Amino acid sequence: MTDQSQQFASDNYSGICPEAWAAMEKANHGHERAYGDDQWTARAADHFRKLFETDCEVFFAFNGTAANSLALSSLCQSYHSVICSETAHVETDECGAPEFFSNGSKLLTARSEGGKLTPASIREVALKRQDIHYPKPRVVTITQATEVGSVYRPDELKAISATCKELGLNLHMDGARFSNACAFLGCTPAELTWKAGIDVLCFGGTKNGMAVGEAILFFNRKLAEDFDYRCKQAGQLASKMRFLSAPWVGLLEDGAWLRHAAHANHCAQLLSSLVADIPGVELMFPVEANGVFLQMSEPALEALRNKGWRFYTFIGSGGARFMCSWDTEEARVRELAADIRAVMSA
Protein backbone atom coordinates (compact mmCIF):
# COMPACT_ATOMS: atom_id res chain seq x y z
CA MET A 1 0.00 0.00 0.00
CA THR A 2 1.32 3.45 -0.85
CA ASP A 3 1.95 6.16 1.71
CA GLN A 4 -1.27 8.16 1.50
CA SER A 5 0.38 11.11 3.22
CA GLN A 6 2.59 11.67 0.19
CA GLN A 7 1.39 14.76 -1.63
CA PHE A 8 2.56 16.84 -4.57
CA ALA A 9 1.90 20.37 -3.33
CA SER A 10 5.52 20.99 -2.38
CA ASP A 11 8.84 19.21 -2.09
CA ASN A 12 8.94 20.72 1.40
CA TYR A 13 6.29 18.18 2.45
CA SER A 14 8.84 15.36 2.47
CA GLY A 15 10.79 14.25 5.52
CA ILE A 16 14.50 13.98 6.23
CA CYS A 17 16.50 11.60 4.06
CA PRO A 18 18.45 8.76 5.76
CA GLU A 19 21.84 10.28 4.97
CA ALA A 20 21.01 13.63 6.57
CA TRP A 21 19.33 11.95 9.54
CA ALA A 22 22.33 9.68 10.16
CA ALA A 23 24.73 12.62 10.03
CA MET A 24 22.61 14.58 12.51
CA GLU A 25 22.55 11.57 14.82
CA LYS A 26 26.35 11.31 14.70
CA ALA A 27 26.68 15.03 15.34
CA ASN A 28 24.52 14.60 18.42
CA HIS A 29 27.18 12.53 20.23
CA GLY A 30 29.23 14.49 22.72
CA HIS A 31 29.86 18.21 22.82
CA GLU A 32 31.08 20.50 20.05
CA ARG A 33 32.10 24.13 19.87
CA ALA A 34 29.26 26.55 19.23
CA TYR A 35 28.48 29.13 16.52
CA GLY A 36 30.07 27.21 13.64
CA ASP A 37 33.48 26.61 15.16
CA ASP A 38 32.93 22.84 15.07
CA GLN A 39 34.26 19.94 13.04
CA TRP A 40 30.97 19.30 11.23
CA THR A 41 30.75 22.83 9.86
CA ALA A 42 34.39 22.67 8.77
CA ARG A 43 33.81 19.30 7.09
CA ALA A 44 30.70 20.53 5.29
CA ALA A 45 32.52 23.61 4.00
CA ASP A 46 35.38 21.43 2.75
CA HIS A 47 32.92 19.12 1.00
CA PHE A 48 31.45 22.12 -0.82
CA ARG A 49 34.90 23.30 -1.89
CA LYS A 50 35.72 19.86 -3.20
CA LEU A 51 32.39 19.48 -4.99
CA PHE A 52 32.64 22.90 -6.64
CA GLU A 53 36.36 22.58 -7.37
CA THR A 54 37.19 25.97 -5.88
CA ASP A 55 38.09 27.67 -2.62
CA CYS A 56 34.76 29.39 -2.03
CA GLU A 57 33.50 31.02 1.15
CA VAL A 58 30.74 28.93 2.75
CA PHE A 59 28.01 30.03 5.16
CA PHE A 60 24.79 28.47 6.43
CA ALA A 61 21.33 29.90 7.06
CA PHE A 62 18.13 28.38 8.37
CA ASN A 63 16.07 28.77 5.19
CA GLY A 64 16.06 29.94 1.61
CA THR A 65 14.45 33.31 2.22
CA ALA A 66 17.17 34.27 4.67
CA ALA A 67 19.90 32.88 2.43
CA ASN A 68 18.69 34.77 -0.65
CA SER A 69 17.96 38.00 1.19
CA LEU A 70 21.26 38.16 3.04
CA ALA A 71 23.24 37.19 -0.05
CA LEU A 72 21.56 39.91 -2.11
CA SER A 73 22.08 42.46 0.65
CA SER A 74 25.82 41.77 0.50
CA LEU A 75 25.90 42.52 -3.23
CA CYS A 76 24.37 45.99 -3.23
CA GLN A 77 23.64 49.13 -1.26
CA SER A 78 20.22 50.44 -0.25
CA TYR A 79 20.10 52.82 -3.23
CA HIS A 80 20.75 49.98 -5.68
CA SER A 81 18.28 47.67 -7.39
CA VAL A 82 18.15 43.94 -8.07
CA ILE A 83 16.94 42.66 -11.44
CA CYS A 84 14.88 39.48 -11.28
CA SER A 85 12.27 37.55 -13.23
CA GLU A 86 8.63 38.47 -12.70
CA THR A 87 8.14 34.92 -11.37
CA ALA A 88 11.22 34.93 -9.13
CA HIS A 89 10.74 33.60 -5.61
CA VAL A 90 12.46 36.70 -4.21
CA GLU A 91 9.77 38.80 -5.89
CA THR A 92 6.64 36.73 -5.25
CA ASP A 93 7.22 34.61 -2.16
CA GLU A 94 9.66 36.20 0.28
CA CYS A 95 7.41 38.85 1.84
CA GLY A 96 9.75 41.74 1.03
CA ALA A 97 12.68 40.13 2.84
CA PRO A 98 15.27 41.04 0.16
CA GLU A 99 14.26 44.70 0.45
CA PHE A 100 14.17 44.48 4.24
CA PHE A 101 17.63 42.99 4.72
CA SER A 102 19.19 45.31 2.12
CA ASN A 103 17.65 48.36 3.80
CA GLY A 104 15.56 49.12 0.74
CA SER A 105 17.24 47.84 -2.43
CA LYS A 106 14.41 47.72 -4.94
CA LEU A 107 13.54 44.62 -6.94
CA LEU A 108 13.04 45.38 -10.64
CA THR A 109 11.27 42.68 -12.62
CA ALA A 110 12.33 41.74 -16.12
CA ARG A 111 10.57 39.73 -18.80
CA SER A 112 11.35 36.04 -18.73
CA GLU A 113 11.05 33.33 -21.34
CA GLY A 114 9.87 30.07 -19.84
CA GLY A 115 10.82 31.40 -16.42
CA LYS A 116 14.34 32.33 -17.51
CA LEU A 117 15.93 35.74 -17.81
CA THR A 118 17.80 36.57 -21.00
CA PRO A 119 20.65 38.99 -21.72
CA ALA A 120 18.18 41.15 -23.66
CA SER A 121 15.64 41.35 -20.83
CA ILE A 122 18.38 42.18 -18.33
CA ARG A 123 19.78 44.86 -20.59
CA GLU A 124 16.33 46.36 -21.11
CA VAL A 125 15.80 46.89 -17.38
CA ALA A 126 19.38 47.85 -16.56
CA LEU A 127 19.47 50.58 -19.21
CA LYS A 128 15.88 51.77 -18.85
CA ARG A 129 16.94 54.75 -16.77
CA GLN A 130 20.31 55.94 -15.55
CA ASP A 131 19.40 59.17 -13.83
CA ILE A 132 19.93 59.99 -10.16
CA HIS A 133 16.21 59.60 -9.38
CA TYR A 134 16.13 55.87 -10.20
CA PRO A 135 17.59 53.00 -8.13
CA LYS A 136 20.86 52.03 -9.77
CA PRO A 137 20.92 48.39 -10.98
CA ARG A 138 23.69 46.45 -9.27
CA VAL A 139 22.60 42.79 -9.08
CA VAL A 140 20.91 40.19 -11.24
CA THR A 141 19.37 37.17 -9.53
CA ILE A 142 18.34 34.03 -11.38
CA THR A 143 16.75 30.83 -10.12
CA GLN A 144 18.14 27.39 -10.99
CA ALA A 145 15.93 25.46 -11.58
CA THR A 146 13.38 28.20 -12.19
CA GLU A 147 10.04 28.60 -10.48
CA VAL A 148 8.34 26.94 -13.47
CA GLY A 149 10.78 24.05 -13.62
CA SER A 150 12.98 25.18 -16.50
CA VAL A 151 16.76 24.85 -16.30
CA TYR A 152 19.44 27.26 -17.46
CA ARG A 153 22.08 25.66 -19.70
CA PRO A 154 25.75 26.58 -19.18
CA ASP A 155 25.80 28.66 -22.36
CA GLU A 156 22.76 30.63 -21.19
CA LEU A 157 24.45 31.31 -17.86
CA LYS A 158 27.64 32.44 -19.58
CA ALA A 159 25.68 34.81 -21.81
CA ILE A 160 23.91 36.32 -18.81
CA SER A 161 27.20 36.60 -16.94
CA ALA A 162 28.83 38.38 -19.87
CA THR A 163 25.98 40.90 -19.91
CA CYS A 164 26.30 41.40 -16.16
CA LYS A 165 30.03 42.04 -16.41
CA GLU A 166 29.49 44.50 -19.24
CA LEU A 167 26.92 46.41 -17.18
CA GLY A 168 28.72 46.17 -13.84
CA LEU A 169 26.20 43.84 -12.23
CA ASN A 170 26.83 41.10 -9.69
CA LEU A 171 25.21 37.73 -10.45
CA HIS A 172 23.36 35.76 -7.77
CA MET A 173 21.78 32.33 -8.16
CA ASP A 174 18.85 31.11 -6.09
CA GLY A 175 19.59 27.39 -6.07
CA ALA A 176 16.70 26.09 -4.01
CA ARG A 177 16.53 23.25 -6.57
CA PHE A 178 20.11 23.49 -7.82
CA SER A 179 20.56 19.75 -7.26
CA ASN A 180 17.68 19.02 -9.63
CA ALA A 181 19.27 21.20 -12.30
CA CYS A 182 22.58 19.35 -11.96
CA ALA A 183 20.80 16.00 -12.18
CA PHE A 184 18.87 17.03 -15.28
CA LEU A 185 21.82 18.45 -17.21
CA GLY A 186 24.50 16.02 -16.05
CA CYS A 187 26.79 19.01 -15.52
CA THR A 188 29.14 19.52 -12.61
CA PRO A 189 28.21 22.11 -9.98
CA ALA A 190 31.24 24.13 -11.05
CA GLU A 191 30.05 24.23 -14.66
CA LEU A 192 26.72 25.66 -13.56
CA THR A 193 28.15 28.27 -11.20
CA TRP A 194 31.53 29.96 -11.04
CA LYS A 195 32.80 28.55 -14.34
CA ALA A 196 29.75 30.21 -15.93
CA GLY A 197 30.27 33.48 -14.07
CA ILE A 198 28.02 33.12 -11.00
CA ASP A 199 29.27 35.21 -8.06
CA VAL A 200 27.10 33.76 -5.28
CA LEU A 201 24.97 30.63 -4.99
CA CYS A 202 22.33 29.85 -2.39
CA PHE A 203 22.36 26.04 -2.45
CA GLY A 204 19.11 24.51 -1.22
CA GLY A 205 19.00 21.40 0.92
CA THR A 206 15.54 21.59 2.46
CA LYS A 207 13.80 20.53 -0.74
CA ASN A 208 16.23 17.64 -1.23
CA GLY A 209 16.10 15.67 2.00
CA MET A 210 17.19 18.03 4.75
CA ALA A 211 15.14 19.35 7.65
CA VAL A 212 16.56 22.86 7.63
CA GLY A 213 19.68 24.69 6.53
CA GLU A 214 20.68 26.27 3.23
CA ALA A 215 24.25 26.94 2.17
CA ILE A 216 25.50 30.26 0.78
CA LEU A 217 28.59 29.94 -1.40
CA PHE A 218 30.59 33.01 -2.42
CA PHE A 219 32.74 32.25 -5.45
CA ASN A 220 33.76 35.90 -5.56
CA ARG A 221 35.21 35.93 -2.06
CA LYS A 222 35.50 39.71 -1.91
CA LEU A 223 31.71 39.90 -1.82
CA ALA A 224 31.66 37.84 1.38
CA GLU A 225 33.31 40.53 3.49
CA ASP A 226 31.50 40.79 6.85
CA PHE A 227 28.84 38.32 5.71
CA ASP A 228 29.19 36.48 9.02
CA TYR A 229 28.11 39.69 10.75
CA ARG A 230 25.06 39.93 8.48
CA CYS A 231 24.11 36.38 9.46
CA LYS A 232 24.48 37.13 13.14
CA GLN A 233 22.49 40.36 12.96
CA ALA A 234 19.69 38.61 11.07
CA GLY A 235 19.39 35.77 13.58
CA GLN A 236 20.93 33.26 11.17
CA LEU A 237 24.02 32.32 13.20
CA ALA A 238 22.94 29.05 14.77
CA SER A 239 24.45 28.47 18.20
CA LYS A 240 24.45 24.73 17.54
CA MET A 241 25.57 25.17 13.95
CA ARG A 242 26.60 21.54 13.61
CA PHE A 243 22.94 20.56 13.24
CA LEU A 244 22.69 22.77 10.13
CA SER A 245 25.99 21.65 8.64
CA ALA A 246 26.15 17.95 9.55
CA PRO A 247 23.25 16.99 7.24
CA TRP A 248 25.20 18.53 4.38
CA VAL A 249 28.07 16.17 5.16
CA GLY A 250 25.62 13.30 4.91
CA LEU A 251 24.27 14.53 1.58
CA LEU A 252 27.58 15.44 -0.02
CA GLU A 253 30.03 12.77 1.08
CA ASP A 254 28.65 9.95 -1.07
CA GLY A 255 26.56 11.77 -3.68
CA ALA A 256 23.16 11.43 -2.01
CA TRP A 257 22.36 15.04 -2.98
CA LEU A 258 22.46 14.08 -6.66
CA ARG A 259 20.76 10.69 -6.32
CA HIS A 260 17.80 12.14 -4.47
CA ALA A 261 17.42 14.97 -6.99
CA ALA A 262 17.59 12.51 -9.88
CA HIS A 263 14.85 10.41 -8.28
CA ALA A 264 12.59 13.44 -7.84
CA ASN A 265 13.23 14.42 -11.47
CA HIS A 266 12.44 10.88 -12.61
CA CYS A 267 9.11 10.91 -10.78
CA ALA A 268 8.20 14.21 -12.43
CA GLN A 269 9.02 12.76 -15.85
CA LEU A 270 6.90 9.73 -15.01
CA LEU A 271 3.90 11.85 -14.06
CA SER A 272 4.29 13.90 -17.22
CA SER A 273 4.36 10.80 -19.41
CA LEU A 274 1.35 9.24 -17.67
CA VAL A 275 -0.92 12.24 -18.27
CA ALA A 276 0.40 13.22 -21.71
CA ASP A 277 -2.44 11.54 -23.61
CA ILE A 278 -5.32 12.69 -21.39
CA PRO A 279 -7.73 14.95 -23.32
CA GLY A 280 -8.05 18.36 -21.71
CA VAL A 281 -4.72 18.17 -19.88
CA GLU A 282 -1.97 20.39 -21.23
CA LEU A 283 1.64 20.54 -20.10
CA MET A 284 2.38 24.21 -19.41
CA PHE A 285 6.19 23.97 -19.36
CA PRO A 286 8.76 21.34 -20.33
CA VAL A 287 9.56 19.02 -17.41
CA GLU A 288 13.23 19.59 -16.66
CA ALA A 289 13.40 19.34 -12.88
CA ASN A 290 11.05 17.89 -10.26
CA GLY A 291 7.92 19.88 -11.04
CA VAL A 292 5.04 19.24 -13.43
CA PHE A 293 2.80 22.16 -14.41
CA LEU A 294 -0.54 21.17 -15.88
CA GLN A 295 -3.35 23.19 -17.42
CA MET A 296 -6.72 21.69 -16.47
CA SER A 297 -10.27 22.89 -16.04
CA GLU A 298 -11.26 24.40 -12.71
CA PRO A 299 -13.95 21.73 -12.12
CA ALA A 300 -11.33 19.02 -12.69
CA LEU A 301 -8.95 20.63 -10.22
CA GLU A 302 -11.72 20.86 -7.65
CA ALA A 303 -12.55 17.20 -8.22
CA LEU A 304 -8.91 16.32 -7.60
CA ARG A 305 -9.00 18.23 -4.33
CA ASN A 306 -12.12 16.35 -3.34
CA LYS A 307 -10.19 13.12 -3.85
CA GLY A 308 -7.69 14.33 -1.25
CA TRP A 309 -4.90 15.64 -3.47
CA ARG A 310 -3.04 18.80 -2.53
CA PHE A 311 -1.35 21.09 -5.05
CA TYR A 312 -0.80 24.76 -5.73
CA THR A 313 -2.59 26.82 -8.38
CA PHE A 314 -0.72 30.12 -8.13
CA ILE A 315 0.39 30.10 -11.77
CA GLY A 316 -2.82 31.33 -13.37
CA SER A 317 -6.36 30.16 -13.99
CA GLY A 318 -6.48 26.42 -14.50
CA GLY A 319 -2.78 25.96 -13.86
CA ALA A 320 -1.66 23.44 -11.24
CA ARG A 321 1.82 22.61 -9.96
CA PHE A 322 2.75 19.10 -8.86
CA MET A 323 6.12 18.70 -7.12
CA CYS A 324 7.96 15.42 -6.65
CA SER A 325 10.34 14.78 -3.78
CA TRP A 326 13.42 12.73 -2.95
CA ASP A 327 11.19 10.01 -1.46
CA THR A 328 8.20 10.12 -3.82
CA GLU A 329 6.88 6.64 -4.51
CA GLU A 330 6.32 5.75 -8.15
CA ALA A 331 3.11 4.00 -7.16
CA ARG A 332 1.84 7.25 -5.65
CA VAL A 333 2.64 9.04 -8.91
CA ARG A 334 0.58 6.45 -10.77
CA GLU A 335 -2.32 6.94 -8.34
CA LEU A 336 -2.27 10.68 -8.98
CA ALA A 337 -2.14 10.16 -12.74
CA ALA A 338 -5.05 7.71 -12.55
CA ASP A 339 -7.14 10.20 -10.59
CA ILE A 340 -6.32 12.97 -13.07
CA ARG A 341 -7.50 10.68 -15.87
CA ALA A 342 -10.66 9.87 -13.92
CA VAL A 343 -11.66 13.46 -13.19
CA MET A 344 -10.99 14.51 -16.77
CA SER A 345 -13.27 11.79 -18.12
CA ALA A 346 -16.06 12.42 -15.63
Swiss-Prot record:
GO terms for biological process: threonine catabolic process. Optimum temperature is 25 degrees Celsius. It comes from the Bacteria. One of its GO terms (molecular function) is L-allo-threonine aldolase activity. Keywords: Lyase, Pyridoxal phosphate. Optimum pH is 8.0-8.5. InterPro entries: ArAA_b-elim_lyase/Thr_aldolase (IPR001597), Low_specificity_L-TA_bact (IPR026273), PyrdxlP-dep_Trfase (IPR015424), PyrdxlP-dep_Trfase_major (IPR015421), PyrdxlP-dep_Trfase_small (IPR015422). Changing residue 207 to R: 1000-fold decrease in activity. Its EC number is 4.1.2.48. Pfam families: Beta_elim_lyase. It catalyses: L-threonine = acetaldehyde + glycine; L-allo-threonine = acetaldehyde + glycine. The modification N6-(pyridoxal phosphate)lysine is found at residue 207. Homotetramer. Belongs to the threonine aldolase family. PANTHER family: L-THREONINE ALDOLASE-RELATED, LOW SPECIFICITY L-THREONINE ALDOLASE. Catalyzes the cleavage of L-allo-threonine and L-threonine to glycine and acetaldehyde. Can also act on L-erythro-phenylserine, L-threo-phenylserine, L-beta-3,4-methylenedioxyphenylserine and L-beta-3,4-dihydroxyphenylserine. This is Low specificity L-threonine aldolase. The gene is ltaE.
